[in-house]
Amino acid sequence: MKIPLKWLKEYLPTDMSPAELAERMTMAGTEVTVLNSRKDKWPNVYVGQIMEVNRHPNADRLVLVKVDWGQGQETVVTGAPNCKAGDKVVFARTGAVLIDGHNGKEMVLKPAVLRGVESCGMVCSERELGLSDEHEGILILPADAPVGMLASEYLGEIILDLELTPNRGDLMCVTGVARELGALIDRLPSISTPDFKATGKDIKDKINIEIKNTKLCTRYTASLIEGIKIGESPDWLKERLIACGMRPINNVVDATNYVMLEFGQPLHSFDYDQIKSKHIIVRPAAEGEVLTTLDGVERKLSPDMLLITEPDKIIALAGVMGGENTEVTEKTASVLLESATFDKHSIRRTAKALKLQSEASARFEKGLSFELAPVALKRATQLILEIAGGQAASGLMDVMPVKKDRNSVVLSLSKVNRVLGLEGEKFDSCKIAKRLGFAWMPEYVPGMEEFGYGSVDDKMRFFPGYWRMDIESDIDMIEEVARIAGYDTIPCLPLDKAIPKIETPPLPGIKRFLRQILSGYGFQELISYSFTSREMLSRVFSGAEPECLAISNPMSSEQEVMRTSLRPALYASLAANRRFEKNGLRLYELGRIYLPKENNKQDEPEMLCALIAGSASEAWWQRNTAGFDFFDAKGIVESLVSRLGIAADFAVSDEPGLTPGYQAGILVGDMPVGVLGQLSPQTADKFGITEPVYMFEINLSKLITRATVRRKFTQINRFPSVERDLALVLDRSITNRQVTDIISEFDLVKNVELFDMYQGKQVAEDKKSLAYHLLFQSDTHTLKDADVDSVMNQILKRLNTETGAVLRS
């Protein structure tokens, strides 16, 4: 929002510099930038004075004008009819950038010879300066214009550019900014109540107004001016519109735009003679209706749009844009002015649907008080009578079907201190309310003292000005008190208590960590509903129906119970993806399951469930792609838990829905935390899955009690390593984990890797052979063969003693 400083000072005289003014408003919550409207716009353009005007020797319609521009005199050839010696003009030297008066494009002024006489510059019209479309003659400046001053400085205007927040629609006008600044500097602005002199007949005999939707239009006011003369606006009015970023059109339209910028209330002017029925109806659009708006575009309307109509035609799109059929033109003799209050939501929807954002709709969208409509209407009528003449009909048409009271807010003065952290009466809320233009009175509501509002004298009822539609509660009022008093005046108080140390729950961090790891492994995350069906759970667990929590009002039979496992959604998703021929799938889900407990309570552990199926790698012509197997899933589990600083063990399990012999329980110490295995053929068939699927499900709520994601620094070993192979014969009941745990206890052993297992004729029937790669390395010196041999002998003795293993010959 752009506000000319000179205009603002007409309502609030102040000696503050533009920078100080901008700083005060910015600190109060409205960011302000100071601009010069024409700074650097006209290089080489100066205020000049015509010294002589002589006839052109070779052309009757041209004259020779000698111009003094402060640093010398130049002769200019021009055809302007209004050149007169002594006039102050705008003189452009060679190199100036102006607007071509014929095509409206920018041009660089060059030396020219016109009918045999050299012209060294130009005396400029308003159009050539980009001020308006006027091109009939040159721009004549006031007699006190200083010769030699840059035109950008003389014609320029200090502009305050406001960055408005959505709730401050009251600052979209000069008077609103004057009120805001006045409150900040404790000076009431001079804003008088406008009125006009009526000399015509009663307006009620001239027009009838009917509102058919009182929710979308709460007030409609109108005035009538007859016998006006449409023409150009005065220079001062045009300049202010241009400074605010608006284009002058004619005196009537310019007056309505001027008042909108002045008071914030959009107005619209109709050609009264084009309203044949003299009956205006405010109603919603009907399906299929169309309107050609002022921009010449035919627009299709919908029933949620509000219209201004006659009984037989549409004449305007309420709050957005007028219709072409009642446009004010040069032939207009009588004008009907509209100033109304429309529903902000309706205007926003209409402007958005038609992609027709206008200055009017921007203001209506923020919400306007019903009290503002007649104020702006009187001011616009007054201004048009001044600049366009005519006679105003007596009175105003004012239709307001539902009478409204002004909003009020009850505020406990002690609450101001509590919210702002003050001690004692730091701020005088009533005095600040007066600076804002608000009224107030004592308030007493019996029985409210117990809620902490203080004594009876502590309560006040505040009545915000009609222009402040954003003040709706006591918190809004407290914000105003702090804003106007100054946030920087609120004292900084040390905390009277130490800030308690709050332990961060480990689970969210663990889940983020696991997501990163699984994404790195190529997994995709699934997020499913927490609801499922008994039938789905029965399919997952091979007919065994686990106890589950039933939903009292399920949306469907497929969402009748809370899930007791994450597997159903993963299996269903896998089957759906395989139908679309997706191969090499890796899916996981992190989420809660819901297990019933005694006394109508439930356990809600966080779980991680994942599955792999299909090819383990992408197809490659040089080798066949292998599918996932049980040990791929086991390796992923081991990697995941090891990244959390945990060592996982595996034990024989008998989990329903998994293949016997191809499943294992996951243990941390002696605590079961999950299950791992291959989907049983029966379960896979129930989901339409035809390939091997391997899954694991881990109870994270249990796992995190042993987890740590702290990273430890490990120095890179500078000494060489030694590799040895070890082949053992041992009972089939001995597991690989038992062997590797014993070997890993020796300090010099850095890695143990099983590379072969044999069961057959070369060993006894109840025996098996396991072969290992062992990596030896010292942190302090280079190992010798004797060092490694000694450790190998110790390993064999331990294995023989604890497992009965012997060296395979």
Curated annotation (Swiss-Prot):
Subcellular location: Cytoplasm
Catalysed reaction, written as an equation: tRNA(Phe) + L-phenylalanine + ATP = L-phenylalanyl-tRNA(Phe) + AMP + diphosphate + H(+)
E.C. number: 6.1.1.20
Domain tRNA-binding per the UniProt entry, residue ranges: 39-152
Main location: cytoplasm
Keywords, comma-separated and alphabetical: Aminoacyl-tRNA synthetase, ATP-binding, Cytoplasm, Ligase, Magnesium, Metal-binding, Nucleotide-binding, Protein biosynthesis, RNA-binding, tRNA-binding
Gene Ontology biological process terms in this record: phenylalanyl-tRNA aminoacylation
Family affiliation: Belongs to the phenylalanyl-tRNA synthetase beta subunit family. Type 1 subfamily.
Name of the protein described by the UniProt record: Phenylalanine--tRNA ligase beta subunit
Organism, scientific name: Dehalococcoides mccartyi (strain ATCC BAA-2266 / KCTC 15142 / 195) (Dehalococcoides ethenogenes (strain 195))
